[in-house]
Regions:
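The alpha-helix within a helix-turn-helix
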Residues: 57
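Contiguous, often N-terminal, cationic amphipathic patches that form binding interfaces
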Residues: 1-46, 50-54, 62, 68-73, ...
Length: 106
């Protein structure tokens, strides 16, 4: 696994590329060093950012208050910080995408 997930003493950081306005919210694979996530919410008034935080929170079973957009609030490329998480569950989820074809750039 490349630099998609970085574990730090205070938690972990994950680099994501989001595609808002999709039919459903789901991880679809990787694009370079980014985890590619389709979001059902549109990129309007922070709806896509809220959807991303909700999705990561539910996916990792952590409170929403522990999930933050560290950088990229207005960009498709973001760094998400999850407080007090060692990354075990996230790495397990992402490992299922490691053997699949790379996601093509859109």
């Amino acid at each position: 696994m490349s630099a998609r997930v970085l574990t730090k003493p205070q938690g972990l950081s994950i680099s994501v590329k989001v595609v808002p306005g999709a039919s459903k919210t789901v991880i679809v694979g990787f694009e370079g060093d980014f985890v590619k996530i389709r979001l059902a919410a549109p990129p309007v008034d922070g709806k896509a950012n809220r959807e991303l935080i909700d999705y990561i929170s539910k996916l990792l079973s952590v409170p929403k208050s522990k999930v933050h957009i560290q950088s990229g609030l207005t960009s498709k490329r973001k760094v998400i910080r999850i407080e007090n998480d060692d990354g075990t569950k996230l790495r397990e989820i992402l490992s299922s995408f490691e053997s699949t074809e790379p996601v093509k750039r859109s």
